[in-house]
Amino acid sequence: MSNIKSSEISDILKMQLKGIDSRIKFEEIGRVLQVSDGVARIFGLNNAETGELLQFDSGDMAVVMNLEEDNVGTVLLGETSKVQEGDRVKRTKRIVSIPMKNGMLGRVVNPFGSPLDGKGPILGKEIDMPLERKAPGVIYRCPVVEPLQTGIKSIDAMIPIGRGQRELIIGDRQVGKTTISIDTIINQKANYETGDPIYCIYVAIGQKASTVANIVNTLKEYGALNYTIIVVAAASDPAAMQFYAPFAGAAIGEFFRDTGRHALVVYDDLSKHAVAYREVSLVLRRPSGREAYPGDIFYLHSRLLERAAKIINNDSVAASMNDLPNNLRGQVKGGGSLTALPIIETQAGDVSAYIPTNVISITDGQIFLETGLFNAGIRPAVNVGISVSRVGGKAQIKAMKKVAGTLKIDQAQYRELEAFTKFGGDMDAVTRATLDKGRKNVELLIQSQYNPLPVEKEIAIIFIGIKGLLSDVPVERVREFETEFLDILEMKYRKDILDMLKQGVLDEKIEKKLNTIASIVANNFK
């Protein structure tokens, strides 16, 4: 037998070992212990994270909500009937997110980015935006000073909204809350056409599919769908989908905000969102508190609404923003904004209930709509007394600030006098004039739905009202006067007056012209 050298043996062994694939892949697999009411308890996923997506063998997905001692509580994103006890579940190691693409504009999607409008797949480069994300820190924000025009006279004049603000729309059912938000979206068409778009996200939570279809058709009819994304979790969808819908809207808005653009997100409505979260929490056996809502219901809405912000206009500072998604790095720009219009439904006008008071305390103001005003034909039915914008005149152009400065006080005085005169008695000339002016201003601020006005026309018509130039026009003909007055301005004075008002200029020369035109038109209505 020939001698074998030890070095040869080691060489042979090394060659043999090189061919061995030692990469062992581990997959954490769990089993469904219990499933009911849209919730599954899973055993065996000891390393699962809160908010992580899990996948069943059937392809259905679930999200981890509870981490308990011997199992994890998850909410199902599909039908409960498709998941059974004993089914295998595996971790995806991905936090729940929405694949954002520029091709999403004009589309109707679910909270996870899947199209619902039957127009085929959504095109464009995909960027995963996490649904849950920390709000920008204080150093990455700047004050709200740029106006977001709603096109609604009473709001733009007395309760102005700025880019980056959170303004609550609150009122009973059927008083025009959704109409205000849709009008605001339609009014952004001019910005889109001039190359300074405000991208709009409308989030429908727990609404009927037919209602959402009507909203889509309205936006399409008025040419607003090109810059709008509609996120839908309908009434027939699982509670988990309704719970995640507003977070999906916020994530889409953050994509525009963090790339230096402007976005507006409407949450319609957060009352149904709170109910969906309560349902999920109760089924997960979380401790309940007031009105059976879980203890963190305030935190649910505060962490959602705090994501609305005006970002500092400095690219290098914005690029270091906290909690940025990795796939967004390198595209971040400063100067963007995300404005939020949450909607809350009250019961019999009770704004002191649990969820309304929570959201009022989180937001930067509220627009309160009243059933009595709506039924009296005063639409939008804004109760100016308890409606407020905490940003105020900072979010108005100079001309609007100048004409609307006294309007809120004037209308409050009118309401007070009107209540007093119901007791009867004689009135002096000043009181009669104040009441007459107040009534005509109320009539001037009435506006039909889906008919937003450009800011320059709002300024012109409010100027006429506060200067008392309608004294010779009967109350019932004020709206006719408004139509004729604005038509004359558009046809003959677009450059001299309207374009100047649009730039915020309202000097003595323009005031004299407006006075003269108003007097001429008023003569036709005596």
From Swiss-Prot:
Keyword Signal: no
SUPFAM superfamilies given in the database record: C-terminal domain of alpha and beta subunits of F1 ATP synthase (SSF47917), N-terminal domain of alpha and beta subunits of F1 ATP synthase (SSF50615), P-loop containing nucleoside triphosphate hydrolases (SSF52540)
Entry GO CC: plasma membrane; proton-transporting ATP synthase complex
Topology in membrane: Peripheral membrane protein
Principal location: membrane
Binding site residues for ATP: G171, D172, R173, Q174, V175, G176, K177, T178
Localization per record: Cell inner membrane
CDD domains hit by this protein: ATP-synt_F1_alpha_C, ATP-synt_F1_alpha_N, F1-ATPase_alpha_CD
Catalytic activity annotation: ATP + H2O + 4 H(+)(in) = ADP + phosphate + 5 H(+)(out)
Pfam families reported in the protein's UniProt record: ATP-synt_ab, ATP-synt_ab_C, ATP-synt_ab_N
Keyword hit for ATP-binding: yes
Enzyme nomenclature, EC number: 7.1.2.2
Positions marked as site (Required for activity): S387
Gene Ontology MF term list: ADP binding; ATP binding; proton-transporting ATP synthase activity, rotational mechanism
EC primary class: translocase
UniProt keyword terms in alphabetical order: ATP synthesis, ATP-binding, Cell inner membrane, Cell membrane, CF(1), Hydrogen ion transport, Ion transport, Membrane, Nucleotide-binding, Translocase, Transport
Subunit structure of this chain's protein: F-type ATPases have 2 components, CF(1) - the catalytic core - and CF(0) - the membrane proton channel. CF(1) has five subunits: alpha(3), beta(3), gamma(1), delta(1), epsilon(1). CF(0) has three main subunits: a(1), b(2) and c(9-12). The alpha and beta chains form an alternating ring which encloses part of the gamma chain. CF(1) is attached to CF(0) by a central stalk formed by the gamma and epsilon chains, while a peripheral stalk is formed by the delta and b chains.
Cited function: Produces ATP from ADP in the presence of a proton gradient across the membrane. The alpha chain is a regulatory subunit.
Family in the record: Belongs to the ATPase alpha/beta chains family.
Protein name: ATP synthase subunit alpha
Lineage: Bacteria, Pseudomonadati, Bacteroidota, Bacteroidia, Bacteroidales
